[in-house]
Design a protein with these regions (language model features):
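Aromatic-rich beta-strand edge motifs centered on tyrosine
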Residues: 4-13, 28-37, 52-63, 75-84, ...
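Hydrophobic residues embedded in beta-strands of well-ordered beta-sheets
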Residues: 39, 63-65, 85-86, 94, ...
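Beta-turn initiation residues at beta-strand->coil junctions
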Residues: 1-4, 16-22, 40-47, 65-73, ...
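A motif-centric feature for acidic-aromatic and gly/ser/thr-rich catalytic loops and repeats
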Residues: 90-156, 162
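A conserved catalytic-core signature of glycosyltransferases
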Residues: 76, 153-154, 181-182
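Right-handed beta-helix
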Residues: 9, 15, 84, 165-168, ...
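Short linker/helix segments within small regulatory modules
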Residues: 175-180
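Short, ordered coil/turn segments that flank beta-strands lining enzyme active or ligand-binding pockets
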Residues: 10, 20-22, 34, 46, ...
Length: 187
């Protein structure tokens, strides 16, 4: 992105990101539920393209997205959750997630077990190389990557891999017995 402008609500949640890439301006707005979990994303592009995604979440422990729903109420993508994200069903095709020891998605496999897509990252989550064309937003550390903003959504806040930092402060106050936890922008 050439430039980005972020807007936050009173709870320090990102509610709007405006990104300019050359002459193209993209504005994304986000909504959250009462527990602070992201429930929707609306994208408006200066070329007239608009997209809406509602996230159907499982909030039983660590919030996981079960489905992405479009503006007509149609499921664009349905996820299967186990200990980690197991698979996605998108456009009538099922892809299974392959992970490394860090929990990052390093590949996708089809129903026959053939690897269709691969991903490799640097230490901060920047994508170094990818193969394949399957639509997939789950990548580094198994978290959602937003192509428009270049940010990872880690449920509580967003991380910019180009700087290796979060773009907002941690809501956790930290502990004087664990001094590094007092740094509001660390993971």
């Amino acid at each position: 992105a050439n430039s980005a402008l972020y807007e936050y609500n009173a709870e320090n949640k990102l509610i709007k990101a405006t990104v300019q890439n050359g002459s193209l301006v993209i504005e994304e707005s986000y909504t959250y539920d009462y527990e602070g979990n992201r429930t929707s994303k609306t994208t408006h592009r200066s070329d007239g393209v608009t997209e809406y995604v509602k996230y159907l979440n499982d909030n039983s422990s660590l919030t996981n997205v079960l489905a992405e729903i479009d503006e007509n109420g149609t499921a664009k993508c349905v996820y299967t959750i186990g200990a980690d994200l197991v698979s996605q069903e998108r456009n009538g095709r099922t892809s299974f997630y392959l992970y490394d020891g860090h929990g990052s998605v390093v590949g996708l496999a089809n129903e026959n077990g053939a690897v269709t897509d691969t991903y490799s990252y640097d230490a901060f989550g920047n994508l170094l190389k990818s193969t394949g064309s399957t639509e997939n937003c789950y990548r580094y550390c198994g978290e959602q990557f937003d192509e428009t903003t270049g940010l990872y959504y880690l449920r509580a806040r967003y991380m910019d891999t180009s700087t290796g930092r979060f773009i907002s402060q941690d809501s956790y106050a930290g502990s004087i017995f664990d001094p590094i936890s007092l740094h509001k922008y660390l993971y």
